[in-house]
Swiss-Prot record:
Residues 1-707, 906-920 are cytoplasmic. This is Anion exchange protein 3. Gene3D superfamilies: Helical hairpin bin, Mannitol-specific EII, Chain A. Residues 134-152 have a biased composition (Acidic residues). It comes from the Eukaryota. One of its GO terms (biological process) is regulation of intracellular pH. The modification Phosphoserine is found at S167, S170, S175, S198. Residues 708-1227 are annotated as: Membrane (anion exchange). Residues 58-75, 480-497 have a biased composition (Basic and acidic residues).
Amino acid sequence: MANGVIPPPGGASPLPQVRVPLEEPPLGPDVEEEDDDLGKTLAVSRFGDLISKTPAWDPEKPSRSYSERDFEFHRHTSHHTHHPLSARLPPPHKLRRPPPTSARHTRRKRKKEKTSAPPSEGTPPIQEEGGAGAEEEEEEEEEEEGESEAEPVEPLPPGPPQKAKFSIGSDEDDSPGLPVKAPCAKALPSVGLQSDQSPQRSGSSPSPRARASRISTEKSRPWSPSASYDLRERLCPGSALGNPGPEQRVPTDEAEAQMLGSADLDDMKSHRLEDNPGVRRHLVKKPSRIQGGRGSPSGLAPILRRKKKKKKLDRRPHEVFVELNELMLDRSQEPHWRETARWIKFEEDVEEETERWGKPHVASLSFRSLLELRRTIAQGAALLDLEQTTLPGIAHLVVETMIVSDQIRPEDRASVLRTLLLKHSHPNDDKDSGFFPRNPSSSSVNSVLGNHHPTPSHGPDGAVPTMADDQGEPAPLWPHDPDAKEKPLHMPGGDGHRGKSLKLLEKIPEDAEATVVLVGCVPFLEQPAAAFVRLSEAVLLESVLEVPVPVRFLFVMLGPSHTSTDYHELGRSIATLMSDKLFHEAAYQADDRQDLLGAISEFLDGSIVIPPSEVEGRDLLRSVAAFQRELLRKRREREQTKVEMTTRGGYAAPGKELSLEMGGSEATSEDDPLQRTGSVFGGLVRDVKRRYPHYPSDLRDALHSQCVAAVLFIYFAALSPAITFGGLLGEKTEGLMGVSELIVSTAVLGVLFSLLGAQPLLVVGFSGPLLVFEEAFFKFCRAQDLEYLTGRVWVGLWLVVFVLALVAAEGSFLVRYISPFTQEIFAFLISLIFIYETFHKLYKVFTEHPLLPFYPPDEALETGLELNSSALPPTEGPPGPRNQPNTALLSLILMLGTFLIAFFLRKFRNSRFLGGKARRIIGDFGIPISILVMVLVDYSITDTYTQKLTVPTGLSVTSPHKRTWFIPPLGSARPFPPWMMVAAAVPALLVLILIFMETQITALIVSQKARRLLKGSGFHLDLLLIGSLGGLCGLFGLPWLTAATVRSVTHVNALTVMRTAIAPGDKPQIQEVREQRVTGVLIASLVGLSIVMGAVLRRIPLAVLFGIFLYMGVTSLSGIQLSQRLLLIFMPAKHHPEQPYVTKVKTWRMHLFTCIQLGCIALLWVVKSTAASLAFPFLLLLTVPLRRCLLPRLFQDRELQALDSEDAEPNFDEDGQDEYNELHMPV
């Protein structure tokens, strides 16, 4: 029985026998005769004769039908005659074809004449793709074998015994197939018809020489059943075993291969993977024929070159976009993949009732789903670095891997594949479908499963394992649906992203790679089947995602509905894991499934489990956020430790190398502008060298529409304070300086500072502290009978001297010692002054125009004037009208109306009405809008008198009869006393304190790292310019200016470009700031041109300016931590907010700190209200050593860090708070 087979049980007819001759006569030297005999044997006519003489099969005759059990018995029988494929392969040196000779051409021509007989009508000849047939190539190979006998063979290098090796390619296809004939073509579709297999041989048989030649070739490669079978050669890239191999198509998995013998494995490979002519499954495009011409000597060169130049895998982590698709039924009860959730950083779910996206939130996962996910990845298929570029190709390999890993049955192959290729729908499809929605029509199942041929676009190793056409109709997806094969399938090509959301696409980073999660219940599976896929490179799978983002990861989970697995929660779990930064970095760098399991364990270490108890109120979850922050901190520390250990080892982990380099470059390029050099004017020189080289770009960067919008916005933001402070300054100085002088000063100094300053984004202007100093100095000059404007000239000259000395000594570093303790006292004091001045002015209006039961006629106004003169301060010039009816009430209405409108628009900015940009525009123009509305109200009431703003006509001083544009330094009306020329150094030092604090703190706020200014700043240069220009202002009688904190921060925010690729729910991030000088020049120029609007400015009532003053004072208080702690004194401890100064400091010690600040404010208020009001800047400066020397003796460092820390970062959210709440500085 060695040459036959044992019949299977049941008395069935035996399988066809394969006869192999054991003894053959020796070979002769005549090669030509051998070729002739071989040509007669392989002639096409012989195939026709063999087929025609085969007895016909009678379908009515009863015969045995073989089951799978019979074939299994046949495969495992020890008597199965077997010829290994490796015995049929030509030696490696035969791959190099010798150049054709004349003798070979003659033999080929003679062979062609002999085999040109027409075949029989039974079976037409079947030729392979890529030429006129395979016969010529087989003939050439046999001729080469004959010629090689006479050629010397190079001896192989000594080494271990050669094992049996298998390969799929041109070599195997050109060699003779395995001579086995199966009884049923449907069960074994890979059976081929061979001339030597027929049980009835007709015609001339091959000569003994030809058969001996073949046998000698087999004997030269002895085969032993005990030869080892190298499983690594049967692995394909992306297989569950994780090892890349040269083969793309494998007959079985590793577990089955270990249980079978080498003969069975070889036979399975022949049946499943060989392309046997005669029983055609699909055309195999041979790489040798595609790449090079037939008979080309360099046919294999491109393949070898391509293998050598294999692309390096990209393991660099990218940004992530995750989409969860679930298998659902539509209205017509047809299955399709429906998007139910997505992740960019936080989870967004589709609301079932409204089909719209919900708000982003932190994903909450069940602990059981995480454990099931870990078990699924451990037991399921893991295909890493899969080299496929289409969804059908990926689906084919996923299904085959599921079959190999025994997750699904082979008969479920078609159903699972159809399920994976179903169409995908998204919530935005119906909205963006247009007039002609595209519904990709599905082809028949056979076309999808059988006609998907590998194309060169798939790459050299991108061949997809296909299924035979003759395996029968695939099972329907749903048993109740007879038309399941007409279900729409996912087909590549066409415009598949018609429903994409451009707004969502803007929020996804440019280099993001997507993860697709497919989960669902199917009725035809008996157990859940899962696969985790990582592609070798990201590919764009059309019609799969909502937006056109290349896909890198896929997770598939299918199973029956009767199991306890919650597929939705399991899909949410893997999607949340992939959106986690550390896990998706580990997924990029994973080499096998153990790395993925380790990453899941790391994720579980940083997760929180909440007990299953009812939570009533958010206050009960306060500890969760703090505990989570602590876990994240420990997690970052572990990652940092790993990076440090990796770096010490001399190499950097993939993905970490770039961050380390970037961090190092940032550290080296960072330049501290406040660092002292130790040389005279060293800081000034560094500022010039740092900032002026960017001067050309400061002009080019202004060519953008955003700069135009910023100019218009900041113009109104700068004009409103100029008018408000100008009107109040005219009141305080009795008209010596007013709106005209302040507008001119703002314009001139603004243009010069924008052109020469180191930080041109600063907006110079008048401020509340300078207004308080001007009032104090005016009262001092009136008390000493000195000329106010002449005294300001000498104060300005001394100011220049002190500024030069401070800049030469690099004194700008002192701004580091000004902590929020001093800033809050400063801002709180100025806010109180604004509020007090507002109601004080309103009181004066009610005094001048009281509410009387009977108002005298116009001729009796002089009597009323005499009666009320004692209550009014002495003034020069003609007095205004008195005792006007309804003036006080209308002034009150105008003041409160201006305040309420501006305050309401500020609150409206942070509301939920309209869009974010519209709210921000309305809120930013709140002050100009409130002024305009109240001016129109006053203009519409013509029978009531209100005091208006004093503005001259044209470019003129406020009081031409009192002063001119140039102020004589030696006095105008009388000589200025010499002692005052020297004593002016004291007020100059005081005004320097105010200018230094406001300018340097404002520059420090603008230069925060969070604002990402790239061109740098210059504290020394800016201070020198503002101080020197202050001396120029004294000579021309113009007010001193400083860097206005609120206006400067508003200017920077208006020029800030925010990143659009921000995950929903994440805080906004700055992309860049348009640092340039043109906007500052234009803003100052427009403010200067506003002097021609004198007729319009004269229509503004002073009561409207009082309302703006009240608005500035109230809004400044709302952003100061001191005011918040002041309210906590009257609040029970259980209602205190979760702030560091509350949770880390005892309540009574927190109140003690607040009381110390209130004591300093009270002392400054007392000094400001007395004759020594000029010295209040000096007392303000004393709060710095108080904080540095005294408070550390009363409080611990931990408490001071919580009470007096500058940890506030700029808020760029369109729904966030405005600049007043972010700053601790006065307006």
